[in-house]
Curated annotation (Swiss-Prot):
Location, primary (coarse class): membrane
GO terms of biological process kind: cell division; cell wall organization; peptidoglycan biosynthetic process; regulation of cell shape
GO CC term (a single one): plasma membrane
Catalytically driven reaction(s): UDP-N-acetyl-alpha-D-muramoyl-L-alanyl-gamma-D-glutamyl-meso-2,6-diaminopimeloyl-D-alanyl-D-alanine + di-trans,octa-cis-undecaprenyl phosphate = di-trans,octa-cis-undecaprenyl diphospho-N-acetyl-alpha-D-muramoyl-L-alanyl-D-glutamyl-meso-2,6-diaminopimeloyl-D-alanyl-D-alanine + UMP
CDD domains: GT_MraY
Entry's transmembrane regions: 28-48, 76-96, 100-120, 137-157, 193-213, 225-245, 262-282, 289-309, 314-334, 369-389
Name of the protein described by the UniProt record: Phospho-N-acetylmuramoyl-pentapeptide-transferase
InterPro entries: Glycosyl_transferase_4, PNAcMuramoyl-5peptid_Trfase, PNAcMuramoyl-5peptid_Trfase_CS
Pathway where it operates: Cell wall biogenesis; peptidoglycan biosynthesis
Protein task: Catalyzes the initial step of the lipid cycle reactions in the biosynthesis of the cell wall peptidoglycan: transfers peptidoglycan precursor phospho-MurNAc-pentapeptide from UDP-MurNAc-pentapeptide onto the lipid carrier undecaprenyl phosphate, yielding undecaprenyl-pyrophosphoryl-MurNAc-pentapeptide, known as lipid I.
MF annotations from Gene Ontology: metal ion binding; phospho-N-acetylmuramoyl-pentapeptide-transferase activity; UDP-N-acetylmuramoyl-L-alanyl-D-glutamyl-meso-2,6-diaminopimelyl-D-alanyl-D-alanine:undecaprenyl-phosphate transferase activity
Database matches in Pfam families: Glycos_transf_4, MraY_sig1
Amino acid sequence: MLPSLAQWLQTLSPEFGFLRVFQYLTFRAVMAALTALLMGLAAGPFVIRRLTELKIGQPIRGYGMDSHLSKSGTPTMGGALILLCIVIATLLWVDLSNRFVWIVLLVTLGFGAIGWVDDWRKVVNKDPEGMRSHEKYFWQSFIGLLAALYLVFSISENSNMRVLELFFSWVRSGFDLNLPPKAGLLLPFFKEISYPLGVLGFVILSYLVIVGASNAVNLTDGLDGLAIMPVVLVGSCLGIFAYVTGSAVYSKYLFFPHIPGAGELLIFCSAMSGAGLAFLWFNTHPAQVFMGDVGALALGAALGTVAVIVRQEIVLAIMGGVFVVEALSVMLQVSWFKFTKKRSGQGRRLFKMAPLHHHFEKSGWKETQVVVRFWIITMLLCLVGLSTLKLR
């Protein structure tokens, strides 16, 4: 919004020439991060007080860690504050005509709505199960598939009209359409090498990345500050990839596919990082507020959607390795328990407790040790991910 306003003012008088600074992505990215950060810090105490007054407190599982019982009643659903800061900061500083920003915002808010309903049922309606798993996965799949279907054509074309034309061309051709190389699966550390996916392959991969990232972040959000800092780190790095991909000069120099308009996602990623840091101010141990599913599901989906647009699905898995391992630990734990129970009549566990961060707590690690060490691991993985910018 502000870039459009600045451009309009410049047409009125040359005295507004200093507003040309609003044309620069880097300036707007910094301002978006600061806007989200300051908004979050200012509104945080009010939101926490309000959640406390409404008795929207986090229920703690009786079979979990004993050290977590003291957290019972801590305000939750604080992720709504994160989303509010992201949306306002993004809309203020982004080019509102950019279609990629709108699709990321819609996916983020869609998954946030799913998380809101889940949290509301758990906390307000006192339903320990919240939204039923099949219901949750249905809506996640619905939003994820719609986004994937739009993106498969949007990445190949530069306007929504051309996206529609390409879609109908795909339908008329009997669902057989050759996509450009930039719509393939890019392999990191290799120059201009991509694996062709086709429309169906692209949609399936994008769906798995968006929905998988959403649930992986949600599973990671089990300790004070554990999920939000990796989200900030990975989101910031994805913003750099968006900047490179959206630039004709940098993408050519670094052998990346050029996707016009993707650079504006740097604004969204910066806003997400700023809002995340503001939330961490109140979420650090001992946490004053939890983000809840409304925040975790939305932020994970946002990371996944941005990664799909900038064609860095594999790099997302690298940088978000903590999220990947946390999700895998749950799947392995459940699968192994069912397998051993079916085979011997008694279920066995691979880990002392899943997700993995609880395994380390059961092994004697302090909560803060688990959190900070997972942060350090994420920092290292993000450096590996960023190295793919040049090591190609």
